[in-house]
Amino acid sequence: MEKADLLVIGAGPYAYAAAAFAEQSGIDVRIVGRPMAFWREQMPAGMFLRSGSDWHLDAAGEHTFEAYFEDRGLSRADLDPIPIAVFLDYTEWFRERKALRVEDRLLSGLAKADGTFVATMEDGSTIVADKVLAAPGIRHFANLPTWYEAVPSGRRAHTSELVSFEELTGARVVVVGGRQSAYEWAALLCDHGAERVDV
């Protein structure tokens, strides 16, 4: 049985930020999850972050985007808005600078016992933690309308499922939604040669 003061469940940007802050505060941290998996696997290559480079993951203000740009020899002016590839590189740079140890494994169960938490991993191992911080990300929270299932499979996709647009070259596409991901995916569909895109 493994132990930790704080178990961070998830390995995305907010998990990294919280774990770094906790470690900086002297807390023994374990991070479990697939490192930046949603961002690497569910985001299209041409996507830009809605946020500019004036924010960062570091509560201490040390490993900021500015520090990353300087270290990489990049210009802030050339990278605003921030491309997804640059964001992924920043998160890896941040993780390395903060020496965050991410265990690439998934949780299968969590129970409370005797004032602690017992996390069971998919491989059957357990971690006992005094505190747990859940940072599962948005992958599991796709909002699908009730009529979604009525549209034949292969003719519908949530934005989190559609990361390659080549198959829609020349197609007519309806994007249902009115927030950032709807407009971003509409623009990406146009960039990849969709005949028509209606939002």
Q: Where is each model-derived feature located?
A:
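Core beta-strand elements of the Rossmann-like FAD/NAD(P) dinucleotide-binding domain
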Residues: 2-4, 122-131
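A conserved short coil-to-beta-strand element within the FAD-binding core of flavoproteins
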Residues: 103-116
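Helical element adjacent to the flavin cofactor pocket in flavoenzyme catalytic cores
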Residues: 85-102, 139-142
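Glycine-rich dinucleotide-binding loop and its adjacent helix/turn
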Residues: 83, 136-193
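N-terminal Rossmann-like FAD-binding beta1-loop-alpha1 element of flavoenzymes
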Residues: 2-31, 174-192
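Glycine-rich active-site loop/strand segments that organize a redox cofactor
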Residues: 32-86, 199
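Phosphate-coordination loops involved in phosphoryl transfer and adenosine-cofactor binding
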Residues: 3-5, 104, 169-171
